[in-house]
């Protein structure tokens, strides 16, 4: 670990000492985890002002609904029958605490340092965080993408609309309970002279091989 990276970490930790924030340096990268999602805007505003994080390079999210679960049947039965074919599990939309985590990537060109700031959305009933588009205009579209893909809402966002899927799209494609095949498929109907939507007739099937790590 470089002494310069440690110096940045110590200074930023001191700035955030009054908040519920945990930090670490791992694989040469600085990461801070915010405990309370209500503090996100205030903490990011403080980082921009006091440590000159002028640039927000990305906003994204992770859905941990199926974390640690496998589509493959393993255990004692494997030694007798071999691996089963992986089957796509039917996960119902679940209100699971700590299911979603939102992640911000910040860059300070003045201090030549990048950090990652993340926060678990602890309350499954409140999938809402404050928008930071007033701090970094680039957040406008990245927050729209997170809303479109994960269904996370951003309070005070100036234009929270879908940005990658069409206006009539149902669901959020990067949620773990969204089927890989989707719900509908579209085609051009020559008789009607327009594009029509029809239910998907493809069965879900796992195409990812079982990976064994020692």
UniProtKB/Swiss-Prot annotation:
What keyword terms does UniProt attach to this protein?
Answer: Cell inner membrane, Cell membrane, Membrane, NAD, Quinone, Translocase, Transport, Ubiquinone
- Per its database record, what is this protein's job? NDH-1 shuttles electrons from NADH, via FMN and iron-sulfur (Fe-S) centers, to quinones in the respiratory chain. The immediate electron acceptor for the enzyme in this species is believed to be ubiquinone. Couples the redox reaction to proton translocation (for every two electrons transferred, four hydrogen ions are translocated across the cytoplasmic membrane), and thus conserves the redox energy in a proton gradient.
The EC number(s) attached to this protein equal 7.1.1.-
Q: Which SUPFAM superfamilies match?
A: Nqo5-like
Which InterPro entries does UniProt cross-reference here?
A: NADH_DH_suC (IPR010218), NADH_quin_OxRdtase_su_C/D-like (IPR037232), NADH_UbQ_OxRdtase_30kDa_su (IPR001268), NADH_UbQ_OxRdtase_CS (IPR020396)
Which reaction equation describes what this protein catalyses? a quinone + NADH + 5 H(+)(in) = a quinol + NAD(+) + 4 H(+)(out)
Q: Under what name is this protein listed?
A: NADH-quinone oxidoreductase subunit C
**Database matches in PANTHER family:** NADH DEHYDROGENASE [UBIQUINONE] IRON-SULFUR PROTEIN 3, MITOCHONDRIAL, NADH DEHYDROGENASE UBIQUINONE IRON-SULFUR PROTEIN 3
* Lipid bilayer topology: Peripheral membrane protein
Origin species, per record, is: Francisella tularensis subsp. tularensis (strain WY96-3418)
Q: How does it assemble?
A: NDH-1 is composed of 14 different subunits. Subunits NuoB, C, D, E, F, and G constitute the peripheral sector of the complex.
Molecular function, one GO term: NADH:ubiquinone reductase (non-electrogenic) activity
NCBIfam families assigned: NuoC_fam, PRK06074.1-1
Q: Which Gene3D superfamilies match?
A: NADH:ubiquinone oxidoreductase, 30kDa subunit
Lineage, top-rank taxon, reads Bacteria
The record lists the lineage as: Bacteria, Pseudomonadati, Pseudomonadota, Gammaproteobacteria, Thiotrichales
Q: Where in the cell is it found?
A: Cell inner membrane
Q: Which family does it belong to?
A: Belongs to the complex I 30 kDa subunit family.
Tell me the gene name: nuoC
Question: What's in the GO CC field?
Answer: plasma membrane
Chief place where the protein resides: membrane
């Amino acid at each position: 670990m470089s002494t310069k990276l440690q110096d940045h970490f110590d200074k930023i930790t001191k700035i955030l000492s009054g908040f519920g924030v945990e930090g670490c340096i791992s694989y040469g990268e600085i990461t801070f985890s915010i405990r309370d999602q209500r503090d996100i805007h205030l903490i990011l505003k403080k980082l921009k002002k006091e440590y000159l994080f002028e640039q927000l390079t990305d906003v994204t999210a992770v859905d941990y609904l199926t974390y640690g679960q496998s589509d493959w049947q393993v255990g004692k039965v494997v030694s007798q029958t071999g691996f089963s074919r992986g089957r796509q599990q039917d996960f119902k939309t679940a209100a699971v605490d700590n299911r979603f985590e939102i992640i911000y990537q910040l860059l300070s060109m003045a201090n030549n340092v990048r950090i990652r700031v993340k926060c678990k959305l602890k309350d499954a009933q409140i999938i809402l965080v404050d928008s930071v588009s007033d701090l970094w205009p680039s957040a406008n579209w990245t927050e729209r993408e997170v809303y479109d893909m994960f269904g996370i809402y951003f309070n005070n966002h100036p234009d929270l609309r879908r940005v990658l899927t069409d206006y009539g799209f149902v669901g959020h494609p990067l949620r773990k309970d969204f089927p890989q095949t989707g719900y509908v498929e579209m085609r051009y109907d020559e008789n009607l002279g327009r594009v029509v939507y029809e239910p998907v007739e493809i069965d879900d099937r796992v195409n990812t091989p079982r990976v064994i790590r020692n």
